[in-house]
Amino acid sequence: MKLGIVIFPSKMIQDKANGLRKRYDPHYALVPPHITLKTPFETQDEQLESIVNELHTIANKTNPFTLHVGKVGSFAPVNNVLYFKVEKTPELTFLNEEMHNGFFTQEREYSFVPHLTIGQDLSDAEHADVLGRLRMKDFYYEQPIDRFHLLYQLENGTWTVHETFHLGKENN
């Protein structure tokens, strides 16, 4: 079973990102715009309950916070990914750290750069052209964040929510 842990921004931010993703992201139909807290990982079905319990613990230790999204960035020359930059708040950093320590120990492929992907798998020329145009536009959004989501991947490659975790002390 393949799982991932993400934050979904508001519908308004998703709509702005999807307006670009339709043209520049071949993964557009597989998953809504999101901020990745933990990249996809494989696990056994019997571990799911322990994972869910650990995520409840992490959510309870994390206060709700404000998400700040703005400007367009790129991971070039490592890869031709375009994204909306997301401010790295203490809460986002804490969530990411908790999901790579202790129970979730796993080698990181990249350092944590919170972002919303708006384009990927672009040729060098297309990447340079689109990045140049988008950097001239003014993007800035903010919204309160009070939850994150555990996703699982279906056989057709799409992702769906398994469970949602509310930040702060949950009502059990």
Curated annotation (Swiss-Prot):
Pfam families: 2_5_RNA_ligase2
Superkingdom field: Bacteria
NCBIfam families assigned to the protein according to its UniProt record, in alphabetical order: PRK13679.1
Active site annotation, chain numbering: H34 (proton donor), H115 (proton acceptor)
Short motif HXTX 2, span: 115-118
Name the record gives this protein: Putative phosphoesterase BcerKBAB4_1135
GO molecular function list: hydrolase activity, acting on ester bonds
Keyword terms, alphabetized: Hydrolase
Family per similarity comment: Belongs to the 2H phosphoesterase superfamily. YjcG family.
Sequence motif: HXTX 1, positions: 34-37
Entry's EC annotation: 3.1.-.-
